[in-house]
Curated annotation (Swiss-Prot):
Keywords: Cell membrane, Electron transport, Flavoprotein, FMN, Membrane, NAD, Phosphoprotein, Translocase, Transmembrane, Transmembrane helix, Transport. Induction: Up-regulated when grown on H(2)-CO(2). PANTHER family: ELECTRON TRANSPORT COMPLEX PROTEIN RNFD (PTHR30578), ION-TRANSLOCATING OXIDOREDUCTASE COMPLEX SUBUNIT D (PTHR30578:SF0). Its EC number is 7.1.1.-. One of its GO terms (biological process) is electron transport chain. GO terms for cellular component: plasma membrane. InterPro entries: NqrB/RnfD (IPR004338), RnfD_bac (IPR011303). The modification FMN phosphoryl threonine is found at residue 163. Belongs to the NqrB/RnfD family. This is Proton-translocating ferredoxin:NAD(+) oxidoreductase complex subunit D. The lineage of its organism: Bacteria, Bacillati, Bacillota, Clostridia, Eubacteriales.
Amino acid sequence: MAEAQIKKNIFTISSSPHVRCDESVSKIMWSVCLALTPAAVFGVFNFGIHALEVIITGIIAAVVTEYFVEKVRNKPITITDGSAFLTGLLLSMCLPPDIPPYMVAIGSFIAIAIAKHSMGGLGQNIFNPAHIGRAALMVSWPVAMTTWSKLSASGVDAVTTATPLGILKLQGYSKLLETFGGQGALYKAMFLGTRNGSIGETSTILLVLGGLYLIYKKYINWQIPVVMIGTVGILTWAFGGTTGIFTGDPVFHMMAGGLVIGAFFMATDMVTIPMTIKGQIIFALGAGALTSLIRLKGGYPEGVCYSILLMNAVTPLIDKFTQPVKFGTRR
């Protein structure tokens, strides 16, 4: 413990500019967990005890994996800094409520051991760990990852039904409106969260409030969620309709699927996004465009996870072309 504390307090000599603040990795991670808590609690209310089991399993598996990997690597144990807890929480919030616990545990293991520590650990991973875990589960168990149940709050449980994006993809916009009883009722369900979907992605209002808290604390920049969500809105409005250009429903698409949780809590991951504001805007534009492309033209109803991972892959390239020019030199 003493050795870990000494390493934590070692100063690194480097050129200016220097960041001077009392923020720490631990404080930021636990603040993000706090911002996600209302949406997670609402997900448990919506989907019942199964959702709680998924969340607890995801968190415990992530923390335990972190502990043993750091033990094997002979690294300081950092399970109290909140990073593994956050990865497990984010992953579980992006999963169906009835997914078997062993799949959740495998997803957390992949997120921590492979996506995070195989790259060197916290601060060195190229891809968002939670999304790597989710993508691995989607490839390995596609049926379990696309099987949904009605909300427990509705009084009926364990009845297979589709998500709003699934209805739109398979049956069209008219059937979507018919299912929810009109456009107004659809928007209300999407905004409040009384709809089907992954555990933590249903309530737009709670996720936005959590995101605004992080913006207020200056832990994330507002440009990424605004540009990403706005890009999806514009492109789905222009090309998402069936009767011509600019006949799509942008309001629905901006609240649907995992866009809000992805834009506020995953696309803003400070480790896997570009360093400059210009680069972050390019990142958000690309993620929004890819999400729209997958939703409108792909075989899968949702594209947030894959769009963010693809943009993670080109982040070094974006950084290369958006880094500030040194004084007295040319690009």
